[in-house]
Curated annotation (Swiss-Prot):
Gene3D superfamilies associated with the record: 3.30.230.10, 3.30.70.240, Elongation Factor G (Translational Gtpase), domain 3, P-loop containing nucleotide triphosphate hydrolases, Translation factors
Source species taxonomy: Bacteria, Pseudomonadati, Campylobacterota, Epsilonproteobacteria, Nautiliales
Binding annotation for GTP: 17-24, 81-85, 135-138
Name used for this protein in its record: Elongation factor G
CC annotations in GO: cytoplasm
Keyword Protein biosynthesis found: yes
Function in brief: Catalyzes the GTP-dependent ribosomal translocation step during translation elongation. During this step, the ribosome changes from the pre-translocational (PRE) to the post-translocational (POST) state as the newly formed A-site-bound peptidyl-tRNA and P-site-bound deacylated tRNA move to the P and E sites, respectively. Catalyzes the coordinated movement of the two tRNA molecules, the mRNA and conformational changes in the ribosome.
InterPro entries recorded: EF-G-like_DII, EFG_II, EFG_III, EFG_III/V, EFG_IV, EFG_V, EFG_V-like, G_TR_CS
tr-type G domain location: 8-284
GO biological process: ribosome disassembly
Secreted recorded as keyword: no
Length: 693
């Protein structure tokens, strides 16, 4: 069956934003105007089409990126809803991989918030072209031009308004389209903003519109020499020329076109859809995705064409109560049909494709075939996890793996009834398959099950899902911080492991140099053995011994990180040497060496942003200092003080309750992991004591 929508009319977009910038409402309206949902759902009432997990309905925040398909002016738009809460950055990162473009939603009052910065950095990392939608223009304190300034200053992006607002707050009537130079005015009486009229620009805004049109044209002609000459020669540019220049500059990530509106009041959504089609790229207009041939290690580029061999990336696994495991996949090239076989190149296993589903946020449509450039769900894959590549076995390819951050917080969980132990283990295993930033381990000493993740909320939601989806009630322990250890001085250490007790002995002898590395560098092992003083086959054993010892720590049992080991000398015995002996020698040399190298404990430091009314500022800052925090900057935003600080994670437990009581419920905060830093010695002593206790 030939494809219905040609490739150049497909858009794969994400809608990314800070919590409460109105992202779900915006998505909801897009689905409404494109005719998928007939009744608009409001997040406040918990009925939005995209937010379909129960907890999301309660908390009003979007947790899982559901992929939804809709149509606008004959174009197929696949929307990946990305979570805005900072504990779910992993989901945002994952959806960035598979997008071709994004709509960044900003709140007209709040502007650029810390999570917007995190999401923006991720979009830069994957080179995702984006357009900005300034939402909530009807709110008190809405200021489009302030948001433009913040995008330039805080996100260092070249924000170019292609619309300016007509009025603001209660008087927000519509927008001026700077490309057509027309006013678009919504009729408040019409059903849910479905009608708007093109009118002449109001006299009092004419001058401002002309000034912003000049700025817009100057920003975009820079990317096109022929247009630049025409423009500076004083000739008028046509609407088509301006549009194609905006598109070119957007795809090259040289500009971020800015639009505005209020999704809640249904104003500005249709022009946003037009902008998605006009300015964001089709799958064949972005750089080809690259992969590696698993056999030769050579790089291969994937041409987004139906005639090429099939290749796709599994970017999300979800368990559905009716059909079982859904594997959301971005199809990069070729076609895939239900009932066929594909190769999971990451695992090197064949998989049978069961059914293929196109998702409309909560309804699903079964299809026989998916084409290149599309996004959809596969039912029936057994071994595929997030980040795996599916491909044609005739052309195996591994598309780049995504890198997932290590968890910073963990808590012990146990089922309320012993009978649920196995049920809990199976459920946690399933959740870990869905979410690579969530880990499950067993504490060897206590036998407890430990779950680790990206923040308190992340783990709360996991425990919540155990209860709702898997019917396992759990008790949780006190949250534990993921401390690390490292050392500050370079040392050399010798260790000879020799055992002689009748029969065959054990002999391994090594000299290692331990060198501290800068934060984030990780572990490196360098083999400097000359002349075979340690035979080749024993060298990996030394490396393994050191890595295992590093995992167990030296001071308080936390993993030792960021160091380099040079193995530079040693000796062996023809009969008595073995891998085991060298592994033990490596491990003991490491432990003894680190003790002399000035070892320290590192703790995760969070970047915290707090917004409070001015009268509470003194208390809040005093409290940050008590928590060993450092205030980094303060600014005024519409009479609210915005405090940026770095605070150790261990001091932030239960902060939301404390902040509420300090500010009578008027303060809000958000935090994101930033870096690791050395713990002051008095606190390090306490941590060591507690661990040895």
């Amino acid at each position: 069956m030939p494809r219905k929508t040609p490739l150049h009319m497909v858009r794969n977009i994400g809608i990314a934003a800070h919590i409460d910038a109105g992202k779900t409402t915006t998505t909801e309206r897009i689905l409404y105007y494109t005719g998928v949902s007939h009744k608009i759902g409001e997040v406040h009432e918990g009925a939005a089409t995209m937010d379909w997990m129960e907890q999301e309905k309660e908390r009003g925040i979007t947790i899982t990126s559901a992929a939804t398909t809709c149509f606008w002016k004959d174009h197929q738009i696949n929307i990946i809803d990305t979570p805005g809460h900072v504990d779910f950055t992993i989901e945002v990162e994952r959806s960035m991989r598979v997008l071709d473009g994004a709509v960044a939603v900003f709140c007209a009052v709040g502007g650029v918030q810390p999570q917007s910065e995190t999401v923006w950095r991720q979009a830069n990392k994957y080179r995702v072209p984006r357009i900005a939608f300034v939402n909530k223009m009807d709110r008190i304190g809405a200021d489009f031009y302030n948001v433009e300034k913040q995008i330039r200053e805080r996100l260092k992006a070249n924000a170019v308004p292609i619309q300016i607002p007509i009025g603001a707050e209660d008087n927000f009537k519509g927008v001026i389209d700077l490309v057509k130079m027309k006013a678009l005015v919504w009729d408040d009486e019409a059903a849910l903003g479905s009608k708007y009229e093109e009118q002449e620009i109001p006299e009092d805004l004419r001058e401002k519109a002309e000034e912003y049109r000049e700025k817009m044209i100057e920003s975009v002609v820079e990317t096109d020499e022929a247009l630049m000459e025409k423009y500076f020669a004083g000739e008028e540019l046509t609407e088509e020329e301006i549009k194609s220049a905006i598109k070119k500059a957007t795809i090259a990530i040289e500009i971020v076109p800015m639009l505005c509106g209020t999704a809640f009041k249904n104003k500005g959504v249709q022009p946003l859809l037009d902008a998605v089609i006009d300015y964001l790229p089709a799958p064949d207009e972005v750089d080809w995705i690259k992969g590696i041939d698993p056999k030769t290690g050579e790089e291969i580029s994937v041409n987004p064409s139906d005639d090429e061999p099939f290749a796709g990336l599994a970017f999300k696994i979800m368990t559905d109560p009716f059909v079982g495991k859904l594997t959301f996949t971005r199809f990069y090239s070729g076609t895939i049909t239900s009932g066929s076989y594909v190769l999971n190149a990451t695992k090197n296993k064949k998989e049978r494709v069961g059914r293929l589903l196109r998702m409309h946020s909560n309804k699903r449509e079964e299809v026989n075939e998916f084409y290149s450039g599309e996004i959809g769900a596969i039912v029936g894959l057994k071994n595929t996890l997030t980040g795996d590549t599916l491909c044609d076995e005739k052309r195996p390819i591994i598309l780049e793996r995504m890198e997932f951050p290590d968890p910073v917080i963990s808590v012990a969980v146990e089922p309320k009834t012993k009978a649920d132990q196995e049920k809990m283990a199976i459920a946690l295993q399933k959740l870990a398959e869905e979410d690579p930033s969530f880990r499950v381990t067993t504490d060897e000493e206590s036998g407890q099950t430990i779950i680790s993740g990206m923040g308190e909320l992340h783990l709360e939601i996991i425990v919540d899902r155990l209860k709702r989806e898997f019917k396992v009630e759990c008790n949780t322990g006190k949250p534990q911080v993921a401390y690390r250890e490292t050392f500050k001085n370079q040392v050399e250490q010798e260790y000879k492991y020799a055992k002689q007790s009748g029969g065959r002995g054990q002999y391994g002898h090594v000299f290692i140099r331990l060198i501290p590395q800068e934060p984030g560098k990780g572990y490196e092992f360098v083999d400097l053995i000359k002349g075979g003083v340690i035979p080749r086959e024993y060298i990996p054993a030394v490396d393994k011994g050191i890595q295992e010892a590093a995992q167990g720590g030296v001071l308080a049992g936390f993993p030792v990180v960021d160091f380099k080991v040079e193995l530079f000398d040693g000796s062996y015995h023809d009969v008595d040497s073995s891998e085991m002996a060298f592994k033990l020698a490596g491990s003991m040399a490491f432990k003894e060496g680190v003790k002399k190298a000035n070892p320290v404990i590192l703790e995760p430091i969070m970047k915290v942003e707090i917004e409070v009314p001015e009268e509470y500022m003194g208390d809040v800052i005093g409290d940050i200092n008590r928590r060993r925090g450092q205030v980094n900057s303060m600014e005024d935003v519409h009479g609210i003080k915005k405090i940026n600080a770095f605070v150790p994670l261990s001091e932030m437990f239960g902060y939301s309750t404390d902040l509420r009581s300090m500010t009578q419920g008027r303060g809000t905060y958000s935090m994101v992991f930033d870096h690791y830093e050395e713990v002051p010695s008095n606190i390090a002593d306490e941590i060591i004591k507690e661990r040895q206790g």
